[in-house]
Amino acid sequence: MKKWTFDEAKEIFSFSFMELVYQAQTIHRANFDPNKIQISSLLSIKTGSCPENCKFCPQSSHYKTYVKKEPLMQIEDVITAAKRAKAAGSTRFCMGAAWRGPRDEDLKLVCEMIKEVKKLGLETCVTLGLLKEHQAVTLKEAGLDFYNHNIDTSEEFYNKIITTRTFQDRLDTLRYVRASGMKVCCGGILGMGETNDDRINMILTLANLEEPAESVTINKLIKIPGTPLENVQDIDPFDFVRVIALARIMIPKSYIRLSAGREQMSDELQALCIMAGVYSIFYGEKILTSANPMPERDNDLFQKLGIIH
């Protein structure tokens, strides 16, 4: 597996926009059907009161936001949501809990949720925070397909965004997930005040993992009132597309997922993202606690682009 250098990554990022998107689309076509997209759904199964201080997150207990604390959902309610997602066209169902990391007793309930969702024929992913090694094994034994744990940004910019857990903590969790035999879902957030070099370094970290993540989530910051990043300057849309193209070129076989922030994107920007290598979006009225494009808008966009899902 090729190990990329920063200079190599920066050279690619600095291509003319047309050349960069052309190369990304060429690699995308070699590995994926350019006229298809995977539909995923993401449900918050435990909301709010998270002890971490991630400056972007409305669920952090450190900030006063619109999010209300809600306990871990009942299994029956999760299954109802999963059935609804499948009926709407999702083939992948993700569950997220606002924890620093799960307690073993809570993990048992999550494992039951995973088993029931799997019975519906859906691919499963959960994001529960930091894991211990034995917890990763437990999730694998429950049949979990993917575990999501984002690095969020570059190692150099990380401490400007989060101080309650380290960048290495995140890498350790990814290592436990990989060792258990599960697939890794990992990405980050763009538009938190980081530089293009930080964005390049984030993709470089993902590309140079011992085994690259099978799933790479790219989020655009949703500026939430009450969080420290509510007034940060927006990322330039062309730089956003450049990061996606860079990820496609450096991590050619991974599913690149356009995640949070689509509600604030134009159809034209989303189309450019798909052209640059996105193969999956999160579908439904909400992504965790934040608004997502209505399904009708997504279906209209897919029809305009001739995309099958």
Curated annotation (Swiss-Prot):
Encoding gene (name): bioB
Main enzyme class: transferase
Positions of the Radical SAM core domain: 35-259
HAMAP family on file: BioB
The name this protein goes by in its record: Biotin synthase
Residues binding [2Fe-2S] cluster: C94, C125, C185, R257
GO BP annotation list: biotin biosynthetic process
Similarity comment: family membership: Belongs to the radical SAM superfamily. Biotin synthase family.
GO molecular function annotation: 2 iron, 2 sulfur cluster binding; 4 iron, 4 sulfur cluster binding; biotin synthase activity; iron ion binding
Keyword field: 2Fe-2S, 4Fe-4S, Biotin biosynthesis, Iron, Iron-sulfur, Metal-binding, S-adenosyl-L-methionine, Transferase
